[in-house]
């Protein structure tokens, strides 16, 4: 099971997450409690292992701005949380992830229409896109087609207490956590460690 830690804002957390086995780190450039500047993101990314995915999170940003930040920071993927369509995705010409809020099984069908490398299924959006700590009914994704499952990233309120059930139900390619590995709004490296251990153990 691949694991993504999202909302990275400091070097120490990023390095520790990689040491503990994180496969991907997320850097939020959209409005968020976890927003990071491109300059700081670049400093962190330059110190990370080559095999770890560096994912930039954007919401309804222009293609030009996304391309500039991607190139300057050394991102490997972009994660799109807004109303981006296939025309914009094609123009980006960057490995991409489309985030969709899940409210019904029909969201699986909608997901198959996007020309992205991965689909991230999340809780329906609130004030901020993602990172709200709320789950959605995982059983809505229990019967997805194999070709979609193989590119599915599961997010939305995941933590050490529910990650095993979430993985058993959805069987995604990757799981994504942000608020579930925080204490009082800050990333907690011990929670990150335990989350990664549990996610990888229950998928063996």
Curated annotation (Swiss-Prot):
It catalyses: N-(5-phospho-beta-D-ribosyl)anthranilate = 1-(2-carboxyphenylamino)-1-deoxy-D-ribulose 5-phosphate. Its EC number is 5.3.1.24. Belongs to the TrpF family. NCBIfam families: PRK01222.1-3 (NF002297). Pathway: Amino-acid biosynthesis; L-tryptophan biosynthesis; L-tryptophan from chorismate: step 3/5. It comes from the Bacteria. GO terms for molecular function: phosphoribosylanthranilate isomerase activity. This is N-(5'-phosphoribosyl)anthranilate isomerase. Keywords: Amino-acid biosynthesis, Aromatic amino acid biosynthesis, Isomerase, Tryptophan biosynthesis. Pfam families: PRAI. GO terms for biological process: L-tryptophan biosynthetic process. It is an enzyme of class 5 (isomerase). InterPro entries: Aldolase_TIM, PRAI_dom, RibuloseP-bd_barrel, TrpF_fam. CDD domains: PRAI.
